[in-house]
Amino acid sequence: MTKLLKLTDVNLNYNTDNNLINVLQDVSFEVDYKETISVVGESGSGKTSLIMLIGGLEKASSGKIEFKNFEISSLKEDEISEIRRKDIGIVFQSFYLIPNYTALENVSLALEINKIKDPINKAKEILDKFGLGKRLNNLPSQLSGGEQQRVAIARSIVMKPELILADEPTGNLDSENSELISNILFDYVKEEKASLIMVTHDNKLANLSKRIIKIKDGKIE
């Protein structure tokens, strides 16, 4: 059966002051369609770098990353950008919302760029699902931290990607908002039959996934 994602002997190295730093070493795993995976490990173990590699935001030093049978490292930048826009949604702990755009405009912009029909109503629909139906016309500065995070997630998944990459999506939130965000992500994955790879330090959140991958010193344990 074809896998949604496959990593084979992936390495990521940096040269700093003539010293070779091994960020990720011989990382191999597969992701099925509709699978949820949590990636755990200590700070600096390489978790975020893994998300960056899969999303095509970093280039592996060696090894192979295949998404739907396309080898990410062999694609041109515009081809990778196209995949990120339509097939892979990325949610970061630190995100950027356009400050002079309303919540609705921040989300609908992704649809407009991709020439999707009826972008406003589609953006309204997902924001309403995220409990922001009454905040559509608010600027980011008028939203709480949890509300801003929900807008950022809505923007990342409004194109209905097959794979969501989430890097500490609840890291800066209180327990109430953390639970809300986690419910949003897992409900979306279930409804849209998508896959999720989520980096988290929260054991309770990690255990919501079907599988847990632990990284230590750049290696999968």
Report each predicted region and the residues it spans:
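The feature captures the beta-strand-to-loop junction immediately N-terminal to the Walker
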Residues: V40-E42
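Helix-to-loop junction immediately C-terminal to a conserved catalytic motif
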Residues: G55
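Conserved ABC transporter NBD signature motif
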Residues: G63-E71
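Conserved signature/switch motifs of ABC ATPase nucleotide-binding domains
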Residues: R85, N138-S141, M159, E192
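Short coil-to-helix segment of the ABC ATPase nucleotide-binding domain corresponding to the Q-loop/switch region
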Residues: Y101-L109
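Conserved ABC ATPase signature
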Residues: L139-Q149
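Catalytic Walker B motif of ABC-type/P-loop ATPase nucleotide-binding domains
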Residues: I164-D167
